């Protein structure tokens, strides 16, 4: 659920902008260029270049991460190509064209990597077989309806999936993780909420999924809002479902992923008479400080890096400031002082992972980020009275499986909890620890076992 920069490199906090560049003259850079950088593991970088009479169009791909057509700008002068990639941390490439070779340096966050490229054929996009199977099925036993509902002056747009047979359906609202995200919770080409809606609707549930504030067809609202206002959005969705004649108004609940699991717990605690059941998929059970500290450690583990005592001390001091300072200005000032005091500490640059202190401060000053790491779910978890299913993958590098599930079970004794061996934060099957930036390289969007377990658990709950 962390809304931060991933390590190894190539965070996908993209700035969407036109890929038009300038060109001085003559050299032929046309085509698809591919090469590999070594960031502790091989990572393929691809530039797609088309020279025109008006200039040059350029996009770039990171196929190992499953992302394609990313925006870039560039300048060409003689046989030199300079590319700027507006990601965070910012990345650049400077290369020299020598025949059919384009050799240079890829730089991000102050680190430079040799990148020798050759002209190649078009790199194929990774397939998403689970989505493809759903989208190609012309005989689905349910129908999809475009719907709108409101929360204050925000008009939310979503998709309501209704089974073809029967009536008076139990229902769920799907609540996405840290975003803002669309109704499918699409990340790196994966659409986990499409899969959940399909699985549940095939098994007798009405399912509502919606574009979050400022996303897709939803009109209004701050896309950077913290969790509490987002929880009111989810309640508006649930209350809309209760107005539908096809829905059993006594059997409506939430399935939330990551921050969506946090929101499901919030609403179950605050509105016990309205929320019939909740499923928390990698939702947090521990306080925000503990969550953040574990995320950083797991990120280093995923990158194959040691996390010694010096880094542990930096980590604890950093998250203590974030967790305890409720005033944003005070927090930012204390973080600035913290980084200044640590300038001579050799562990600091390793901890920063190529990101500047200013970038860190700016990120954690965002309300939608700060709220997560200042939140302690304990009181809300203790107040959950409805049936609850809490799940985690053992290779989750964002919400540590053992601590979070253990805490949830302790605070909600009646909850059903399950840990899935070898699954990551998105419930994809992984062979080993990987950072979140690797999720796009995995063809699987969600483990079929997880999908079936959620269906089975909900079916058992609504029977009682």
Question: Which residues does each predicted region cover?
Answer:
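Central antiparallel beta-sheet cores of small beta-barrel/beta-sandwich binding domains
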Residues: 27-98, 103-111, 141
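Conserved alpha/beta-hydrolase
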Residues: 195-217
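Short alpha-helix in the alpha/beta-hydrolase fold that links the catalytic acid
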Residues: 386, 399-410
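Short beta-strand element of the alpha/beta-hydrolase
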Residues: 168-178
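Alpha/beta-hydrolase active-site loop
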Residues: 224-245
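N-terminal cap/lid segment of alpha/beta-hydrolase-fold proteins
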Residues: 124-167
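Accessory cap/linker subdomain of secreted extracellular hydrolases
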Residues: 279-379
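Short beta-strand/loop motif that positions the catalytic acidic residue
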Residues: 384, 390-392
């Amino acid at each position: 659920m962390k809304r931060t920069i991933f390590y190894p490199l190539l965070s996908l906090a993209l700035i969407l902008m036109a890929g038009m560049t300038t060109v001085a003259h003559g050299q032929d850079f046309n085509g698809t260029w591919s090469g590999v950088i070594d960031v502790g593991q091989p990572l393929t970088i691809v530039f797609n270049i088309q020279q025109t009479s008006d200039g040059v169009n350029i996009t770039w791909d990171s196929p190992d991460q499953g992302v394609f057509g990313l925006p870039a700008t560039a300048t060409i002068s003689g046989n030199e190509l300079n590319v700027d990639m507006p990601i965070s941390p910012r990345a650049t490439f400077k290369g020299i064209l020598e025949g059919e070779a384009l050799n240079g340096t890829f730089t991000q966050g102050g680190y430079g990597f040799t990148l020798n490229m050759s002209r190649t054929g078009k790199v194929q996009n990774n397939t998403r077989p689970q989505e493809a199977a759903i989208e190609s099925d012309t005989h689905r036993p349910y129908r999809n309806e475009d719907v709108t509902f409101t929360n204050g002056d925000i008009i939310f747009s979503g998709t309501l999936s209704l089974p073809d047979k029967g009536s008076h359906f139990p229902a769920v609202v799907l609540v996405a993780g840290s975003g803002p995200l669309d109704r499918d919770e699409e990340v790196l080409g994966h659409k986990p909420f499409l899969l959940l809606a399909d699985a549940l609707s095939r098994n007798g549930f009405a399912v509502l999924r919606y574009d979050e504030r400022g996303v897709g067809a939803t009109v209004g609202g701050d896309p950077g809002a913290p969790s509490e206002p987002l929880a009111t959005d989810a309640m508006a969705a649930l209350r809309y479902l209760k107005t539908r004649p096809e829905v059993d108004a006594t059997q409506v609940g939430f399935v939330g992923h990551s921050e969506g699991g946090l929101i499901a717990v919030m609403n179950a605690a605050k509105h016990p008479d309205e929320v019939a059941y909740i499923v928390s998929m990698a939702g947090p059970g521990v306080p925000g400080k503990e969550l953040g500290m574990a995320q950083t450690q797991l990120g280093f583990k995923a990158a194959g890096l040691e996390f010694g005592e010096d880094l542990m001390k930096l980590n604890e001091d950093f998250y203590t400031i974030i967790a305890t300072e409720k005033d944003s200005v005070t927090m930012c000032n204390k973080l600035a002082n913290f980084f200044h005091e640590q300038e001579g500490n050799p562990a600091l640059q390793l901890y920063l992972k190529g990101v500047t202190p200013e970038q860190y401060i700016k990120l954690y000053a965002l309300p939608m980020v700060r709220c997560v790491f200042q939140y302690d779910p304990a009181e809300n978890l203790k107040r959950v009275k409805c049936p609850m299913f809490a799940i985690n993958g053992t290779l989750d590098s964002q919400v540590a499986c053992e601590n979070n599930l253990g805490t949830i079970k302790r605070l909600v004794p009646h909850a059903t909890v399950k840990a899935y061996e070898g699954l990551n934060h998105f419930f994809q099957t992984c062979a080993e620890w990987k950072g979140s930036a690797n999720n796009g390289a995995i063809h699987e969007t969600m483990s079929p076992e997880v999908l079936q377990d959620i269906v089975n658990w909900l079916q058992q709950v609504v029977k009682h």
